[in-house]
Curated annotation (Swiss-Prot):
The protein's name in its UniProt record: Alkyl hydroperoxide reductase AhpD
InterPro entries xrefs: AhpD, AhpD-like, AhpD_core, CMD-like
Group of enzyme by EC: oxidoreductase
SUPFAM superfamilies documented for this protein: AhpD-like
GO process terms (BP): cell redox homeostasis; response to oxidative stress
Disulfide bonds: 131-134
Catalytic residues (positions): 131, 134
Amino acid sequence: MSLETLKTLIPDYAKDIRLNIGSLANETILSEQQKYGCYLASAHAVGEAQTLRAIEAEARGKLSVEALNAAKAASAIMGMNNVYYRATHLVSNTTYTTMPARLRMNVIGNPGVEKVDFELWSLAVSAINGCGMCLDAHEAELRKHGVTSEQIQAAIRIGAVVNAAARVLAAEAALAAEPA
């Protein structure tokens, strides 16, 4: 599978999503590694089988083994951090925001790829998972490293489109499995 295959699976009612998959893949504002790492981290975050298989296959042709693993690691660690930090931010008792997380997250300090790339991937996943506190933290870190607003937006857009594609395909699969 590939992004082209993924696009063919998207029904006509979601044509905008199908077109966005292709247009984002053709954008040059992010490096190839940044772009396909965002796609892969986002696909792992949403976990829908067809989306994940298509994007994983595409990414294998574009990313080094180290970058593949780092994109997956970004999704994994954000799966934990986004829930934890979103919860501490949302709970009314502010005590939790002052407590140490006491969760292992060493991959953030040593992801095996450029820090900026890992931060972009973490940002895309944080957008999918809806953690405002994490989005603010990753955006601030990216800005410190000279990443532009347009590049940050591109990562978020990739996350949004991958999420939408996965939701469409999951809904279609659920309907297809319904007994007649």
